[in-house]
Swiss-Prot record:
GO annotation (BP), single: defense response
SS bond list: C24-C31, C46-C50, C53-C95, C61-C69, C79-C81
Subcellular location per the Swiss-Prot or TrEMBL entry: Secreted
Name used for this protein in its record: Theromacin
Tissue and organ distribution: Coelomic liquid (at protein level). Expressed in large fat cells in contact with coelomic cavities, in intestinal epithelia and at the epidermis level.
Family stated for the protein in its record: Belongs to the macin family.
InterPro entries for the chain: Macin, Macin_sf
Induction remarks: After blood meal ingestion and upon bacterial challenge.
Signal sequence interval, chain numbering: 1-22
GO cellular component assignments: extracellular region
Length: 97
C-alpha cells in the first residue's frame, strides 16, 4: 500500500511540474545539459538515438537556446540526425524517449 501512495504522489508531482513547465518539454532534448544525467540510463544519447531509431549516419548536438523555458534549460542543445534513412522506429521502446 505504501508503494501505491508513493507512486500516486510522484505522479501528481510530475503532472504539476509538466503543467507549470509545459513549454519546457518542447525545448528539451537528449542533448540538454540540465538533463544529461539521464542520458544512457533513461534515454539513448544523440548519436545512438539517430543510428538506431532513424538509421542515420550519426547524431550531433547543436546549440539551441530555449525559447519556452530559458530559466530551466540554460545552454540548451538539440539533437540533429545526419542523413536519416527512415522515419522514427516507434516499435522500438528505446526510441520512445
Amino acid at each position: 500500500m505504501e508503494l501505491k501512495s508513493g507512486l500516486s504522489i510522484l505522479l501528481c508531482f510530475g503532472i504539476c511540474i509538466a503543467v507549470i513547465n509545459a513549454g519546457c518539454f518542447e525545448d528539451w532534448s537528449r542533448c540538454s545539459p540540465s538533463t544529461s544525467r539521464g542520458t544512457g540510463v533513461l534515454w539513448r544519447d544523440c548519436d545512438s538515438y539517430c543510428k538506431v531509431c532513424f538509421k542515420a549516419d550519426r547524431g550531433e548536438c547543436f546549440d539551441s537556446p530555449s525559447l519556452n523555458c530559458p530559466q530551466r534549460l540554460p545552454n540548451n542543445k538539440q539533437c540533429r540526425c545526419i542523413n536519416a534513412r527512415t522515419a522514427k522506429d516507434n516499435r522500438n521502446p528505446t526510441c520512445w524517449a
